[in-house]
Design a protein with these regions (language model features):
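Long, histidine/aromatic-enriched segments associated with O2/redox biology
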Residues: 3-180
């Protein structure tokens, strides 16, 4: 299991990336949920070194391949002795970082039994993200979609978008801004 991070870590970043700036949904957020199947039998047969290169992070610590700790900055310019990028050009973490935007995200594991036709385990991630505009998510997905090595091991099965209403002020009610 890989540690999953690269979320906004400071209050200002939530304002910049997560909470809607104005209109009836000011201080609300967009929530996108995806069900992502992992072809676990293939992934489990993949060597640890290739798994880490696929993510661009170390499996145990979650650190970038150029760091030691989970929250160390990625050095996207670092090259090894043969002149290759330490974090490969098709690594998931590199590509997500290069999209030049941020979202609040979290993934939860799921298991849904086995496929009746193939006998393969139906397992993966329920990916949940929060962002001030759905375009942030779209930009990241477009950047990942064309080059991400992780796509060899996953299939997106379902997706939904929701709006999370802003909080309620004292004496107010949920959705009040929608009707004002």
């Amino acid at each position: 299991v890989y540690k999953r991070q690269v979320n906004p870590r400071h209050t200002d970043e939530y304002k910049d990336y997560v909470f809607i700036d104005d209109g009836w949904a000011k201080n609300g957020t967009y929530c996108i949920i995806r069900r992502i199947q992992i072809h676990i039998e293939t992934w489990d047969r993949t060597a640890l070194e290739e798994q880490e290169a696929t993510f661009g992070r170390k499996r145990i610590s979650g650190a970038p391949l150029t760091g030691k700790k989970e929250f160390d900055e990625m050095d996207l310019d670092a090259k090894d002795s043969s002149g290759e990028y330490v974090i490969p050009a098709d690594a998931h973490a590199r590509l997500a970082h290069e999209a030049k935007t941020s979202i609040k995200r979290r993934a939860y594991n799921y298991t849904a039994g086995t496929n009746d036709k193939t006998g393969a385990l139906e397992t993966g991630l329920l990916f949940i993200s929060f962002q001030k505009a759905t375009q942030q998510f779209i930009d990241i997905q477009n950047h990942l979609g064309h080059k991400d090595k992780l796509n060899e091991y996953i299939t997106h099965r379902a997706s939904a978008t929701f709006i999370v209403l802003p909080g309620v002020k004292k004496g107010g009610y949920l959705g009040e801004t929608l009707f004002d």
